Amino acid sequence: MTIKDWYKLTFLIESDSEEIIIWKLNELGIFSFSFEYLIKNKNKKEVNIWLPVADWSESSRFGVEKIITKLLNINAPTNQFFDWSIIKEEDWLTSWKKYWAPELVGNHFLILPCWINLNEKFKDKKIIKIDPGAAFGTGSHPSTYLCLEKMDNILFSDKKILDIGSGSGILSVAARLLGAKEVCAVDNDYLAINATKSNFQLNFGNLNNLNTYLGSFNEVILKNQLKQFDFVLCNILAEVIKEMIPNIYKCLRNNGEVIFSGILNSQKDEIIKILIQNDLKLLDVSTRKDWACISAQKASDPT
């Protein structure tokens, strides 16, 4: 295995800027990052971002600085705001783990990084064991919270589930824990498909009840004729969701439901409008900080 070096980018933000930073990093395809409270100043957080040296040229790193500076309206010189360092692969493989801890979501879920032992006080929870590796987080993004909270109140027993943009596979695992008989996971990143399989195996000891598809959702739907799902889970960016809604409608059973997350509050009205235009009935909207989760239903065909 080739040993890689990693850039570590560190800077400080106001605590209430965390969500917009997460959104922008996800949009840029950057998933290896953490946020830490400062002991001496609870209104500030330290952001740490890890980027593989081989993939990030000087101009690319400057581009990230420029985007973040504009996003946060920073006037200070970049060399005073951003701190870059290089860490070795072997240090990276252990150092990033210290930023993750077990997290309770909803009434029943506990997200448990696989290297942490389960505390006995949580043994009655539905445990989602996750090994995020270097590419994916452990589910701490507010949009993931919202989706899991919504799922926590739904009966998935014997249902057929489609997870669009599966990422680490956390929603696929949750659906199976809630009793889903079949989970289909779709992602256009082979790392995500591998992570979904790995985390499914980690939780259930096998890949039974899981089917994975590599490619964009619209392409996969047409090629594999995926349809007749009871529930669709879609935790991705709003701009991508808008393009998928017509095909999501087609792959739902009558009375099937879809849960959309990854939507900023400022975008939810537009998404709701498109849902209604595509004959999907709005069921519920929930919010967490700057993010929204929308659930909708495909009505039965008229008889």
From Swiss-Prot:
Its main location: cytoplasm. It is an enzyme of class 2 (transferase). One of its GO terms (molecular function) is protein-lysine N-methyltransferase activity. Its EC number is 2.1.1.-. GO terms for cellular component: cytoplasm. It catalyses: L-lysyl-[protein] + 3 S-adenosyl-L-methionine = N(6),N(6),N(6)-trimethyl-L-lysyl-[protein] + 3 S-adenosyl-L-homocysteine + 3 H(+). Pfam families: PrmA (PF06325). It is found in: Cytoplasm. Signal peptide: none annotated. GO terms for biological process: methylation. S-adenosyl-L-methionine binds at residues 144, 165, 187, 235. Keywords: Cytoplasm, Methyltransferase, S-adenosyl-L-methionine, Transferase. PANTHER family: ELECTRON TRANSFER FLAVOPROTEIN BETA SUBUNIT LYSINE METHYLTRANSFERASE (PTHR43648:SF1). NCBIfam families: prmA. Belongs to the methyltransferase superfamily. PrmA family. Methylates ribosomal protein L11. This is Ribosomal protein L11 methyltransferase. It comes from Prochlorococcus marinus (strain AS9601). The lineage of its organism: Bacteria, Bacillati, Cyanobacteriota, Cyanophyceae, Synechococcales.
